[in-house]
């Protein structure tokens, strides 16, 4: 069972900012003095992955053309909208790792626990995948070792 993830303190694989932020995390579930991190509803994951695949295909098709930067900006905008709509009250991570000309952008935990919920959302854990608007997926690389969350 992986350690529980928390907003504002636990690490991500991408270096900028390197922690799960802005969150905000659960207002009433505190793990190791920090708010618990929550993923998106598992029912919303498939649609979000389909939108991400379409955005990635559009960006890849534009690579090496004068329209590459515009394709990235367009993909970032459409994915940010899709992520925000799918997220609802789930926690959002803002990745500033550059994917020139724009950063990876907003992302959400798409592999949260299927058996443990926090505020009716899947509990976030170390090793979970964060799908971001641009670029490759991110992962939660550190959680609270004293709280383990299953499935």
What spans do the regions from the language model cover?
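Intrinsically disordered, low-complexity proline/glycine-rich segments
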Residues: 1-151
């Amino acid at each position: 069972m992986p350690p529980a993830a928390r907003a504002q303190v636990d690490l991500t694989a991408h270096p900028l900012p390197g922690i799960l932020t802005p969150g905000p995390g659960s207002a009433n579930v505190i793990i190791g003095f920090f708010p618990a991190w929550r993923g998106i509803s598992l029912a919303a994951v498939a649609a979000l992955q389909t939108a991400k695949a379409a955005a990635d295909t559009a960006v890849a098709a534009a690579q090496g053309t004068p329209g590459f930067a515009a394709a990235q900006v367009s993909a970032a905008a459409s994915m940010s909208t899709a992520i925000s709509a799918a997220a609802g009250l789930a926690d959002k991570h803002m990745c500033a790792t550059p994917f020139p000309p724009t950063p990876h952008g907003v992302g959400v935990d798409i592999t949260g626990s299927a058996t443990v919920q926090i505020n009716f959302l899947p509990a976030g854990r170390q090793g979970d995948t964060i799908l971001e608007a641009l670029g490759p997926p991110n992962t939660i690389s550190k959680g609270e070792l004293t709280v383990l969350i299953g499935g």
